[in-house]
Every structure is written in C-alpha cells, then in structure tokens.
C-alpha cells in the first residue's frame, strides 16, 4: 500500500507571471522595467509556458501526477479596465482541457501576486475599489470557465503583504539599534524578497513610480500591507467566494496562506503566539465558510524573547538562504487543523536547490509528515510541489531553482526532466 489512498491529489504548481512570459500589461512587468527596479532581472519570455503548456502538462502526466495547480493571469484577461480579452479566456480553457485529457485535475488560482497595471494606477491593494475590480474579473472568468473548474483558489498567499510589512518593521528596528544587517531567517521565503532593496528603491524611484504608477508608493499585492489593506484583501476574497457560490455552488473554493512553522524558544512563547495570530488566526473569520484552505510552507521560524532566532549553526540552507527543514510542513498542518476544520490542501511546498537528491529527500520527508497527519484523521486532500519548472523567482530572477523540470533559457527553452518529478509521480495513488 502506498503513502496515500485513492482520491488524494499529487501535483505541481506554477504561477502565470513566473512561467508564461511576456505578461506586458501587469504591474510586475512594469516594475521590472524601472531604472530603480526591485527585480534582479526582467522576466521577458519567462520559460514560455504560455506556448509550451501542452509539453509541460505531458511531462506531469507521464510522471504519474494527477493534478496541476496554475493561475489565470488577470492582466491578460483584462489588460484595460472593463475590456476583457476573449482569446485569452480561450487560452486558459485550452489549458484546462489539456489537463483533463491527460488525466490531471486543474486547480485554478485567480490571483497569484501579479495584477493589471491599471489596478495599481487606481490605488492598488490599499484601495477599497480593488474589491469591486477583482469581483468583476472573477465573475467574468467564472461565467466563461466555471463549468470546467471544480477547484478554485481565489487569492494566493493572501497574507503575504502583512508578512512583508512585518519584515520591514523588523529591519527598521534593527537599523535603529545599529544591529547587524544579517538577513533574518525566513525573510525571503518564497517571494525571493530583498526587503533592503525594496526600501531603497522606494526612496530612489519615487519620481519614476509617479510616472508609471501615478503614485510614489504603488500598492501592488506584494507591497508592505497596512491592516486596512489586509482587510481589503480579505473582503475581496469573500466577495469572490460569494460570486463563485452564486454561479457554481458545487465548486470547491478557498484561498492560500503563507505559513511558517513558528517554534517558540525559551522566553519567546508570547511573541510566537502573537506571530501565529498575525500570520494565521486573525484570518479565520474570513475563511471559516470556505470549502478548503491552501497551506503553503517552506521552513520554520524560531522565536525567542527578542524576536526571530538565527538559523542553527551548521544547519543546511537552501538557495533562498533559509533553513532546509521539511518537517515544518507537518507541524503547520497540525497547527492549522486545530483552528480550521475544513479540507486542507498543501498548495505549495518545496526547495530551491541545485542538488536534486536533496529535493527528493525533502519531498519524501515532507510527504511523510502529510501521511502522518492523514493517519490522525486530519483532512489533507492533496500535495502540490512548488514548482513544476525552474522559473522566474520574482526579485531573485532566474537564479533560484525550485523546479522538477530544468529549463535551458539560452537553448530554445529546452526542458530536462529531473528525477524528482518521477519520484513525486510515484507517490500518486492513482498510478
């Protein structure tokens, strides 16, 4: 008997801006072109998944995966306010149908960090207007594609802006106290965020931002978020869920959250409790009616009396400079399940490494933890590895290799499947 039973989803995840290429109407694309850009390099063609999705889906199917989580790019669907592009809807319809033809269940994310440039020019994610903008986009997509989708994530990592805000606040406190400029553990998890560069470019690029975004401080989804902005994101989620329920009541809908394995050290118990409250617990009133929650975890965060404790000496680090700690996933699932009682999906979990044997070991240990949770009757229904492809890792560009498939961007985007894809596939109970 395998690790998981029939009906459990084993898949991989991508995000449109990171893999498709030429997302020219998005805020991220605009930021990449700035003189004082927060991005190490521009995304350009990314890994051309937009034109090669059939090939990439075929690789997943051949490996034995039974699900694929991907995002629909809002900036492609609605490049100008109120002007929806039918050909782009048809593109995503083709992606969905390709998944089904190859035996993969499509899990569709409606917003994965990038937004249309016009949304940011109109106030972005700190403006209440974005709730209605997002709702109109969601309604359009669901009316067109909803009959072909069973699982929808409204917003990816809805808590990311608040996490970035916390990072910025900690950094400022360190500077004020003449502290070391050493990167804090967990600071760059997933987004590849360089908070120092973000702050510097906000200062230097104000005039450029005024020209491009109509404001000196554009409020993208991945900007440092205020509590009011956090509330706006959650109201946008709730309105989207309402729309989807009205159109397709049987569709399973939820969002995803970025969650650290927060471990209190002696004297840090109250701080750790406050961190978990900010990162997870305060979202419960907004998601308690959702049919599932997407859990996204990459490592742990140890909290002492004075805040985050450095990574243990001699600990293995990933390319992202955080601790290799696959056990974190099980700990997070168990913590979440005590407070959220719906279905859980691991919608992202993985590492950036050039050593695929370490990736395989990571997947093995992490999925052992998932299986242990299921054995204790925690309703975990799927595991999605981040990411399918070595891709554009936001501020860090193409230097971080998370993928199950290598992409040679200098040689015609040639794909090379890594052994880790086959390893993940053999975990699928349907194989």
Per-range role (PLM):
Residues 1-52, 57, 61-66, 77-431:
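Non-catalytic scaffold segments within catalytic domains of secreted glycoside hydrolases
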């Amino acid at each position: 008997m395998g690790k998981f039973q029939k009906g459990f989803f084993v898949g991989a995840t991508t995000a449109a801006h990171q893999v498709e290429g030429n997302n020219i109407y998005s805020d991220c694309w605009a930021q990449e072109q700035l003189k004082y850009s927060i991005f190490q390099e521009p995304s350009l063609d990314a890994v051309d998944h937009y034109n090669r999705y059939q090939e990439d889906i075929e690789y997943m199917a051949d490996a034995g995966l039974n699900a694929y989580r991907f995002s629909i790019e809002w900036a492609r669907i609605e490049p100008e306010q109120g002007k929806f592009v039918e050909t782009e809807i048809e593109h995503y319809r083709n992606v969905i149908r390709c998944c089904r033809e190859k035996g993969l269940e499509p899990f569709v994310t409606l917003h994965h960090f990038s937004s249309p440039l016009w949304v940011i020019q109109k106030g972005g994610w700190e403006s209440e207007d974005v709730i209605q903008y997002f709702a109109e986009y969601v309604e359009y997509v669901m009316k067109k594609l909803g009959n072909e989708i069973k699982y929808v994530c409204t917003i990816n990592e809805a808590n990311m802006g608040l996490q970035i805000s916390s990072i910025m606040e900690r950094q400022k406190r360190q500077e004020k106290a003449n502290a070391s400029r050493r990167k804090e553990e967990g600071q760059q998890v997933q987004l590849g965020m360089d908070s120092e560069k973000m702050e510097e470019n906000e200062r230097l690029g104000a005039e450029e931002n005024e020209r491009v975004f109509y404001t000196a401080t554009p409020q993208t989804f991945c900007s440092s978020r205020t509590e009011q902005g956090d509330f706006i994101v959650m109201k946008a989620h709730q309105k989207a869920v309402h729309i989807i329920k009205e159109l397709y009541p049987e569709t399973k809908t939820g969002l995803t959250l970025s969650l650290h394995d927060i471990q209190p050290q002696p004297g840090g118990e109250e701080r750790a409790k406050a961190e978990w409250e900010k990162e997870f617990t305060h979202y419960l009133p907004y998601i308690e009616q959702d049919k599932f929650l997407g859990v996204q975890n990459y490592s742990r965060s140890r909290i002492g009396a004075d805040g985050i404790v450095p990574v243990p000496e001699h600990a293995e680090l990933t390319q992202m400079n955080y601790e290799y700690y696959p056990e974190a996933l099980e700990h997070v699932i168990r913590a979440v399940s005590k407070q959220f009682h719906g279905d859980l999906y691991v919608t992202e979990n993985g590492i950036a490494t050039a050593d695929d044997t370490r990736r395989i070991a990571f997947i093995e240990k992490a999925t052992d933890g998932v299986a242990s949770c299921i054995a204790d009757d925690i309703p975990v229904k799927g595991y999605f590895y981040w990411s399918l492809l070595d891709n554009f890792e936001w501020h860090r560009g193409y230097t971080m290799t998370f993928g199950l498939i290598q992409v040679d961007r200098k040689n015609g985007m040639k794909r090379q499947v890594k052994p880790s894809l086959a390893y993940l596939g053999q975990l699928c109970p349907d194989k």
